Amino acid sequence: MTHNQELIETIIADQVHQELHSIQDFLRWTYSTFNRSDIYYGHGYNNAWDEALQLILTTLALPIDFPNEYYAAHLTRSEKEVLLRLIIQRLEKRIPVAYLTHQAWFCGLNFYVDERVIVPRSPISALIQEGFAPLLPQEPKRILDMCTGSGCIAIACAERFPEAEVDAVDLSSDALDVAQINIERHNMLDRVYPIQSDLFHDLAKDQYDLIVANPPYVDLEDLSDMPAEFHHEPEMALGSGVDGLEITKKILYAAPDYLTEQGVLVCEVGNSMVHLIEQYPDVPFNWVELKNGGVGVFALTQAELMQYRHLFQ
């Protein structure tokens, strides 16, 4: 029996729902329970408190900034039962909270998510909020979000640059269905356009001022060692060959044909940055310092991509 299974048996045996009455009771108890468990935090939240807060308030249809003075409000029996069922799922099946609530936050915006897409967590969010300064010479009018998934990066870019149009590309029709939900939720039907394509294969020869790419980049070794929570995400959105760079190299090779002369590619490769640096020591990757933490995001100009293109064949 695993440690989490022991916790679940204790929850059932103690008939917790009879002793917990208020929002505050459930927050404290859930926080303690998560702290005692061996669940992994890394899908939008990095600690037990934030996960407990998100799970409970979202499930109760309450805002995350719900006033503390109302935390003493009592819950109905049915609300308690729903919360306990979700908490047990989090412990037993190691399902990320975002999939349990179907809600995730990115750049201060709320997105619908389910297991057809990975949970939004890209450190590129910091660059979006800063308007990609100082990487861009001017505000972009045309943006391409490659490997869009839930559409969070595309929509956040459209919010940050009100005059821009954004193409949101993904190979997965399932992912694009989720992106469409979010495009409609954020009233972006006339500015964010979902496109099914194997990278650039089915795109018109448009030119973009900015290409943002968050492709699969987990290498084979890391993929096999990932915590159970990651196995609920679509594998095609995580792994990318032995070195994690199979898809990134294709993007690097094709991107200059789709960028304006002043255009910039911003791409996330996470821990696979080590392999990228080793394989291409002569390429002047601009590894961006991210104010919210995180590593593995680089920028290259159209001219740089064209100059070193022969290396990515």
UniProtKB/Swiss-Prot annotation:
Entry EC no(s): 2.1.1.298
GO cellular component annotations of the record: cytosol
Broad enzyme group: transferase
Example of a GO biological process term: methylation
UniProt xrefs under InterPro entries: DNA_methylase_N6_adenine_CS (IPR002052), HemK-like (IPR004556), Ribosome_uL3_MTase (IPR017127), SAM-dependent_MTases_sf (IPR029063), Small_mtfrase_dom (IPR007848)
Catalytic activity annotation: L-glutaminyl-[ribosomal protein uL3] + S-adenosyl-L-methionine = N(5)-methyl-L-glutaminyl-[ribosomal protein uL3] + S-adenosyl-L-homocysteine + H(+)
Gene3D superfamilies the UniProt entry points to: DNA helicase RuvA subunit, C-terminal domain, Vaccinia Virus protein VP39
Source species, domain of life: Bacteria
Record's keyword terms, sorted: Methyltransferase, S-adenosyl-L-methionine, Transferase
Methyltransferase keyword on record: yes
A GO molecular-function descriptor: protein-glutamine N-methyltransferase activity
Matches recorded under PANTHER family: 50S RIBOSOMAL PROTEIN L3 GLUTAMINE METHYLTRANSFERASE, RIBOSOMAL PROTEIN UL3 GLUTAMINE METHYLTRANSFERASE
Function: Methylates large ribosomal subunit protein uL3 on a specific glutamine residue.
NCBIfam families: hemK_fam, L3_gln_methyl
Family: Belongs to the protein N5-glutamine methyltransferase family. PrmB subfamily.
Protein name, per record: Ribosomal protein uL3 glutamine methyltransferase
Organism of provenance: Pasteurella multocida (strain Pm70)
Classification lineage: Bacteria, Pseudomonadati, Pseudomonadota, Gammaproteobacteria, Pasteurellales
